[in-house]
């Protein structure tokens, strides 16, 4: 069995409402699904005889601010039995919650926490959804495209006080001169 068989079999077997779009390539299969059917689709891929996905390699997020459902959540899966890679993608906005897959793949707990911490995508029924990479008092989600590059606060160690200090960052500038003339144009002074 190969990617082509798994693709054809999945296309013929899966309910059409579970999958918005399917693509096949030599590197693996891709399924686009709605957040409402994500858990059912992953359950099918894990438990069905002709797919047998045993490994959740990674869950990652992508921010597309121009889209209505701006966050893309990507599940990278591996079937060691059939030597096949499968990528499942779903989209969410700021308020849409995605079903947690920790009950199917226990390792998903860490990756769902990372996606929540970095992008703010929330997962329903996650046993411990809290920050994993940023500090507990951190405000915002740093991998969103609208998050400022310098952040909102500066965190530094103050040696005289022997403690960590958080200070708001001043982002405004009092004066800035822009020279709009091109350096390649010849100036004629007279």
Swiss-Prot record:
It comes from the Eukaryota. Pfam families: Complex1_30kDa. It is a peripheral membrane protein. The keyword Electron transport applies. Its EC number is 7.1.1.2. GO terms for cellular component: mitochondrial inner membrane; respiratory chain complex I. The keyword Nucleotide-binding does not apply. It is found in: Mitochondrion inner membrane. It catalyses: a ubiquinone + NADH + 5 H(+)(in) = a ubiquinol + NAD(+) + 4 H(+)(out). It is an enzyme of class 7 (translocase). One of its GO terms (molecular function) is NADH dehydrogenase (ubiquinone) activity. Keywords: Electron transport, Membrane, Mitochondrion, Mitochondrion inner membrane, NAD, Oxidoreductase, Respiratory chain, Translocase, Transport, Ubiquinone. InterPro entries: NADH_DH_suC, NADH_quin_OxRdtase_su_C/D-like, NADH_UbQ_OxRdtase_30kDa_su, NADH_UbQ_OxRdtase_CS. Its main location: mitochondrion. Belongs to the complex I 30 kDa subunit family. HAMAP family: NDH1_NuoC. Complex I is composed of at least 49 different subunits. This is a component of the iron-sulfur (IP) fragment of the enzyme. Core subunit of the mitochondrial membrane respiratory chain NADH dehydrogenase (Complex I) that is believed to belong to the minimal assembly required for catalysis. Complex I functions in the transfer of electrons from NADH to the respiratory chain. The immediate electron acceptor for the enzyme is believed to be ubiquinone. NCBIfam families: NuoC_fam, PRK06074.1-5. PANTHER family: NADH DEHYDROGENASE [UBIQUINONE] IRON-SULFUR PROTEIN 3, MITOCHONDRIAL, NADH DEHYDROGENASE UBIQUINONE IRON-SULFUR PROTEIN 3. This is NADH dehydrogenase [ubiquinone] iron-sulfur protein 3. It comes from Arabidopsis thaliana.
């Amino acid at each position: 069995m190969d990617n082509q068989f798994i693709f054809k079999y999945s296309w013929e077997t899966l309910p059409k409402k579970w999958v918005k779009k399917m693509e096949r390539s030599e590197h693996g299969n891709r399924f686009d699904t709605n957040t409402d059917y994500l858990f059912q689709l992953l359950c099918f891929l894990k438990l069905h005889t002709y797919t047998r996905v045993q490994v959740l390699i990674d869950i990652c997020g992508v921010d597309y601010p121009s889209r209505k459902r701006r966050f893309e959540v990507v599940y990278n899966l591996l079937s060691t039995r059939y030597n096949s890679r499968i990528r499942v993608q779903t989209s969410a906005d700021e308020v849409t919650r995605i079903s947690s897959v920790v009950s199917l793949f226990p390792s998903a707990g860490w990756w769902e926490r990372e996606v929540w911490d970095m992008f703010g995508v929330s997962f329903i029924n996650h046993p411990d959804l809290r920050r994993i990479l940023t500090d507990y008092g951190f405000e915002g989600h740093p991998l969103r495209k609208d998050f400022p590059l310098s952040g909102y606060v500066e965190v530094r160690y103050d040696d005289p006080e022997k403690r960590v200090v958080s200070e708001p960052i001043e982002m405004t500038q009092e004066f800035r001169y822009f020279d709009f003339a091109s350096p390649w144009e010849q100036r004629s002074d007279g």
